[in-house]
Amino acid sequence: SRDFGFLRPHLQGHRIIAMDYRGRGKSDYAEDFTSYNIVREGTDAIELLDHLRIDKATVIGTSRGGLITMALSRLHPERLKGAVLNDIGPDVAAEGIARIFEYVGKTPPFGDLEEAAQAVADGHKEAFPDVPFARWREQTEFMWDNAPGGGIAIRYDARLRDALTGQAGAGEAADLWQLFDGLRDMPLAAIRGANSDLLSPETFVKMQDRHPSMIATTVPNRGHVPFLDEPESLAAIHALLEQTK
């Protein structure tokens, strides 16, 4: 839920519900790590809406959250007013997946958050060339916690790596284009980082071809993922919210 920390101040007047998916943040870890999949996580989101007595919502999905949003559009389209996909599409580039597997589920090799922030800043300087260190320092606090015995700790169940590896090995990848097509009949915005290694320009064009009314925005000097407080991101989000209010 901390992924939306930079966006939240720009959505005054809107009710914001930012959930920690199972096994992340302050949510409990699942007994069965195979439940870390987009269908189960989407069901969790619907159960949260039920608990809050919310009939329909506009969903903003960043990265994996966007995959969950696509799944929801097929499983529970009646619950969605519209959607924003942040740097994710039905074709996920292998280069980006490989980069994610370099760190997912692993204990970060840093002594403290300051060292971690410097490493993150150095690692993202090509894809995010104009982002000041202070932003990366804040982003680091969203991503990790100080560990009690020193060093830093991830804020999610390390077995997420096992779930992702198992799904890939078993060939359980969903037909994401079929899921994406579930968004055809509702307002949709898609945001892409110009330097993204997960959402290619070619996939972005295909998305527009299949959803001609989609609000499509490319954010300069951003990789995976835009922070969502960039002017281009905010313009797309507010335009979408105008359609769903």
Question: What do the predicted segments below correspond to?
Answer:
Residues D55-G96:
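Conserved hydrolase catalytic core segment
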Residues G111-G166:
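Conserved alpha/beta-hydrolase catalytic His-Asp/Glu region
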Residues V39-A57:
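Conserved acidic catalytic loop of the alpha/beta-hydrolase fold
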Residues D145-D209, T218:
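Conserved serine/cysteine hydrolase catalytic core
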Residues S1-Y29:
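Conserved HGGG/HGGXW glycine-rich cap/lid loop of the alpha/beta-hydrolase fold
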Residues F4-G5, S27-F33, E95-G96, P201, ...:
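Conserved catalytic-core motifs of eukaryotic protein kinase domains, centered on the activation segment
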Residues I17-R24, G89, P220-G223:
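Short beta-to-alpha linker loops that shape the active-site pocket of alpha/beta-hydrolase fold enzymes
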Residues V219-P231:
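Catalytic histidine-centered segment of alpha/beta-hydrolase-like enzymes
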